[in-house]
């Protein structure tokens, strides 16, 4: 009877453990670090954190000054997402600082930041890095015309109308929302930063100032320039959201009734905070609005394979597959404004792609110009990741055997040449056969 070596017998349990561990790693969701002022925030904002856990996020809760904090180890990011619910932090613990968080964003990480009137310098510096400027500490957004009936008299418990939301369903959700309850610090966007998104703005009667002091100078933010929630999508598709209110994500604001303190104002049994918070988290953590390029093909019409080089004026067909991430699965993207450019230095052809089946395609005639060209799709729309595809091809001139023998526009020149030849022939015949008469004596 053949004996099995002891080493092989012992190796089987070890392999099983390794496979089990690998399965656990693969099954885990996006790794998310949550920084809190204190761990009590985990209980006061439990509904928001529960919505993340229900969607498969792996949350790690730590205080913002924990000395063991680290985002990067051996050049690798330890987390996919970062949530900062610690507005009053003065110094992050461990290896985390504003520069580290900026590097995390530059590496494609997603960050959700919630501030308050007790905002510390680190969040202010982080906002400046992203084109957002917070107002001073102890200031708040004030609106004497759009405050809640439960406000204590300072008019800082703001009722924000959904008309002030950014018109981008991918970011703020597609369903209609009840009014939003907000209490926190105001922000303004850097006008020189085109990447900043004004997700939720104050009304025309809002402003940001110290609620317990008389106004002696022009407020930091006034009217619709007052940002309550702002976003940013970097050129590397990293996403960041800044909320001026930590209470915006709290269970108390999620479950609170809302009614403006104005005669005849409608009362709502619940705010729209929860729905908006979930929609914002889905966008910032790249569950929504994520596009990718699938297979790309191009060939002459009537053929199936791309040639080594195209010829000027060829009729070609270009196809591209574009997919969108939806509920964790890649599905065909539905868009009617995707354009294709055929570019050498400048575009020679720009045309819309039409959806056909699960891909987008178009047929067009190549320009009568030879050189090195690119099929280019550059799709950049609000709320979606930047989609870019470029395929380089060569376009050569006609071979000498491919030119037309006779060009219609040259028929007059042909006629003049042949008529000249015929005239010369007739003249030659007449001249050669003409004989002078002999003179008589």
Curated annotation (Swiss-Prot):
GO cellular component: intracellular membrane-bounded organelle; oligosaccharyltransferase complex; oligosaccharyltransferase complex A; oligosaccharyltransferase complex B; plasma membrane
BP GO annotations: protein glycosylation; protein N-linked glycosylation; protein N-linked glycosylation via asparagine; regulation of protein stability; response to cytokine; T cell activation
Annotated pathway: Protein modification; protein glycosylation
Cytoplasmic-facing ranges: 433-441
Listed Pfam families: OST48_MD, OST48_N
Keywords: Endoplasmic reticulum, Membrane, Signal, Transmembrane, Transmembrane helix
InterPro entries: DDOST_48_kDa_subunit, OST48_MD, OST48_N
Segments crossing the lipid bilayer: 413-432
Signal peptide: 1-28
Any one Gene Ontology molecular-function term assigned to this protein's record: enzyme activator activity
Source species, domain of life: Eukaryota
Subcellular location: Endoplasmic reticulum membrane
Membrane topology: Single-pass type I membrane protein
Residues on Lumenal side: 29-412
Subunit field text: Component of the oligosaccharyltransferase (OST) complex. OST exists in two different complex forms which contain common core subunits RPN1, RPN2, OST48, OST4, DAD1 and TMEM258, either STT3A or STT3B as catalytic subunits, and form-specific accessory subunits. STT3A complex assembly occurs through the formation of 3 subcomplexes. Subcomplex 1 contains RPN1 and TMEM258, subcomplex 2 contains the STT3A-specific subunits STT3A, DC2/OSTC, and KCP2 as well as the core subunit OST4, and subcomplex 3 contains RPN2, DAD1, and OST48.
Function comment: Subunit of the oligosaccharyl transferase (OST) complex that catalyzes the initial transfer of a defined glycan (Glc(3)Man(9)GlcNAc(2) in eukaryotes) from the lipid carrier dolichol-pyrophosphate to an asparagine residue within an Asn-X-Ser/Thr consensus motif in nascent polypeptide chains, the first step in protein N-glycosylation. N-glycosylation occurs cotranslationally and the complex associates with the Sec61 complex at the channel-forming translocon complex that mediates protein translocation across the endoplasmic reticulum (ER). All subunits are required for a maximal enzyme activity.
Entry similarity comment: Belongs to the DDOST 48 kDa subunit family.
The protein's name: Dolichyl-diphosphooligosaccharide--protein glycosyltransferase 48 kDa subunit
